[in-house]
Amino acid sequence: MNNFILLYGEALDYPQQVSVDKKGKAYYKFNAAVERESGIIDILPIVVEEDTPAYNVLADIDEIGEIVGAQLLITGEIRTRNIKDKLDVSVRALSIKEDNDYKGITNQVIVTGYICKEVPIRTTPRGLLIADLVLAVNREDDSKLSDYIPSIMWNGTATRAKEKLRVGDCIE
């Protein structure tokens, strides 16, 4: 799999329809609060396609309880698209499970992609080195599309990325 994400977090709002594709299939978006190992909470946009297992689970949760506040285990893919010259990054949920007692891996991302541009390195005001990468991750469906996923590497990893990675290199 070229693009895999696993998240555990709390649904913050009710899914709202955000688009309909050419085939008439609707897409819904909601935000989830996902806690890092450090305790920092990230707010991530989750997109669910109509008539998928993930959508059906949300519909079931809505029937028997409240989606907002539900603890969800989400697996899916990172998706990107350009909207008015701004990169929109979201998680496309392939499966969702309500689980108030989940104790496994809570945040995991695995992507395999190609370096799109020369790796710039910069120093933060605190003196930390950062390399900003953009990976082109090919979708595994028949669309022949790619998602351009921004990634950050820190300190020694940033230095090695600058020294060793070239445009077109495939990394995981």
Report the location of each language-model feature.
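Single-stranded nucleic acid-binding surfaces, predominantly the OB-fold ssDNA-binding core
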Residues: M1-E172
